[in-house]
Amino acid sequence: PARQLDLPPCKSRRADAFITVKGEQTDMKDVKVLIGNYGSGKSELALNFAMQAAARGDRTELIDLDMVNTYFRLTERGKLVAQKEIRLISPNFACSGIETLSLPAEVASAFALDWDSVIFDVGGDDVGATALGRYHRDFAALPEGALEVLNVVNIRRPLASTLEKVLHLQEGMQTHARLRITGMINNTN
């Protein structure tokens, strides 16, 4: 039998609807992908973006695809996320002490279900970005303007301390994720 999804209630709908080619009106999904080097602050930013979206009344899904950094997981913030009515999807076995993680099937719900805002927290290098590449066709099917892929940069991190290093990391992440980075966030502290 099909597994029942526990979806947060929809408090309000966003006003930025668009018309499809067939003339049907549908809500525009806001999808943010935060990608960047290990220790750049992606997970905290992803959490903050999700909390802002939920505060607006958006049905919000937060997806932890960070398969690289097992030291900080969004799963550890599960209680806070649940209080804000944000649906959190984390790698299988996250926070269990098992080092080999796998992606849950629920990640596909970001594309199949009617979420207003979906935020992806993606691994800290080109290897971590490979997990995202599995969904490149789903991202390509999103309406124009619905997707932002943001490279989070902290120049205090050794692998991102120069422009050349940042651009080298970005090139590898774009290649492995099969997505073009559309903007950068300077998260240097």
Please give the residue ranges for each predicted region.
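Conserved lysine of the Walker
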Residues: 42
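N-terminal phosphate/diphosphate-binding loop that engages ATP/GTP or pyrophosphate donors
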Residues: 52-106
